[in-house]
Design a protein with these regions (language model features):
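Short gly/ser-rich loop at a beta-strand->alpha-helix junction or flexible surface loop bordering the NTP-binding
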Residues: 1-178
Length: 178
């Protein structure tokens, strides 16, 4: 594909629920700003190579590649009837079955994209929290806000148990993003 795929909304939330890395992830500062991606301070050599950068890759093939990768991380396949992605323009929404495109018609604020594989980015949890208002109930979103500002995480996808972990964001971080 010519541009990276950016996971957003519920797909990003699912990703963040299974991929709690112990090391910081590589951050890209803007969705379509080639300079910000080229000047990454952290090397991307250790990122998984999924084949999303192949010339002439069909979108339907990309859906399968991304879905397989997410399943390999532990996301149940039945949660992936569609993959939420972020696009810049409304005309980019015409995609094959499997992608659900959400228009974000401005550059993504610096630091709010995380590169998880070559050609695959995910919005960070601050941005995902704001997007969650489109599909979570108010109590669910409130719980999610507590989780990302607290020192624990509820593992929604497997055990349903709370896990202690370092604080990821502060309330001020969320307010600054909004």
């Amino acid at each position: 594909m010519d541009l990276p795929i950016v996971l957003s909304h519920k797909t990003a939330w699912l990703y963040h629920n299974v991929a709690r890395p112990s090391e910081p992830l590589s951050r890209a500062s803007s969705l379509y700003d080639e300079d910000s991606l080229a000047n990454e301070a952290e090397p991307t050599a250790n990122l998984p190579k999924l084949g999303l950068d192949a010339k002439g890759l069909r979108a339907s093939t990309a859906v399968g590649i991304v879905a397989d990768y997410l399943v390999s991380l532990g996301i149940p396949r039945e949660e992936l009837d569609h993959i939420d992605t972020l696009v810049n323009f409304d005309f980019e929404r015409s995609t094959p079955a499997g992608f659900r495109c959400h228009v974000f018609g401005a550059p993504v604020p610096p630091g709010h994209l995380i590169e998880v594989a070559e050609g695959l980015l995910v919005v960070d949890e601050a941005m995902c929290f704001v997007q969650a208002g489109s599909w979570m109930s108010e109590p669910e979103q409130l719980e999610y806000g507590y989780e990302i500002c607290a020192r624990y995480h509820l593992n929604h996808l497997s055990t349903g148990d709370y896990i202690e972990m370092g604080q990821r964001y502060t309330v001020a971080d969320l307010i600054a993003y909004c």
